[in-house]
Amino acid sequence: KCLHIIKPEDKDLRFALDHYLMNFFWRKYPARILRENAPKFAKAMANMPEWKNVIKEYGIFQRLQLSITRKGKLRMAKPVMKFNKWRKKKKGLIGSRIQWYRVLERHIFKKMPLRHDWVFIESFFGKSYSDSPKYLYEYLQKTRGDKYRYIWVLNNKSEALAKTGKHTRVKMNSLRYVYYASRCGYRIFNVRQPAWNKKRPGVVFLETWHGTPLKKLAFDMDDITSASQNHKTLFYKHGREWNYLISANRFSTDVFERAFVYDRDKILEYGYPRNDILYADNKEEIAAEVKKELGIPEGKRVILYAPTWRDNQFYDRGKYKFTLALDLGRLQKEFGEDSVVLLRTHYYIADILDLTEYEGFVYNGSQYEDVSRLYLASDICITDYSSVFFDFANLKRPILFYAYDFDEYADEIRGMYMDMEKELPGPILRTNDAVVDALHH
């Protein structure tokens, strides 16, 4: 009944309900539903507008069971469900791969001596060669060279990393990851470490973090929808392992001390290493390189659009939905002759965007490793609640704040550390009309 009363424009609500309905079909349907009611549920699944998108989130055997259910074949769905339950139970008895790696970690790797000439480096859970860890690493390569062995956590090969000095690349949560994490005397991370990956006595852990906070963090948050209930406890435990925490400014220092419950004496208020490039003597050359890499034509105004991650875009563990609020079609019509849009989204949803209809006007920089280089290639920045504006402001270029859901976001999701209507370095725009008008001027 819920599916029938939802308005067509309520896409996010439909997507969430579709997901929960799929979970019902996947976990309970064959065992709980009477055979005579099977056609009704099959019809409900057949009418799901988001079927193709939601089904992608499930494994091959789950998809098989759901597809059979969608055809109303209850008899066939039951044995598939039983097989899935058996498979899951068997996997639990055997243990996951990382569990076996941790056995080696406890009984072998952590009994081997620490290597104080090894540096373990990770940026965004191994997703990219980027951010402050990248620039600290390159500085160490330049000034210390072979004095240290550098171990980079990176899931995919990086041409930029390959051009640097000697290093070792390991994949996140691989056996080599567990080995080097157990033995390296130094760690440089820009996000929290895995809960199981506890450092040994004698290890020096530098946490660079990844941005000046605009949205409330950790112990400053009243409600957390995209994290488990023990989020704050884990955050506190992680912070106890950090020997030092980098802060970009006094504002960040005050926030980190309170939100992370962290010792102020261990906060290094030095600014972010990643921002050094914004003051480089050759920044115009770097900007030209970035445009060439992304295929952006020379001579066009580059509009960087970097919307933040919203907690209400989470709908299940590890699963997210996203709808782009900026009207790209209208921007193309208004500014396509002399401008292009460079889109930079959160890594959670970087892979689910389809921009084919805007080819030649919108360039997806979401997978580009180094956002600091994107700043140099951009003439203007449009964001909302993302802390990117703190970094972009170093360039003293125009910044627009497209906060179409300002009231909802500020009051219901996380809240802000700043009074956005009074303290932001640019106008707050709540409609596409306002964005177009601002870009014209």
Can you say where each PLM-predicted feature lies in the sequence?
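Extended catalytic core of nucleotide-activated donor transferases of GT-like folds
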Residues: 134-138, 166-233
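Catalytic binding pocket for nucleotide-activated donors in carbohydrate/polymer assembly enzymes
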Residues: 356-360, 387-441
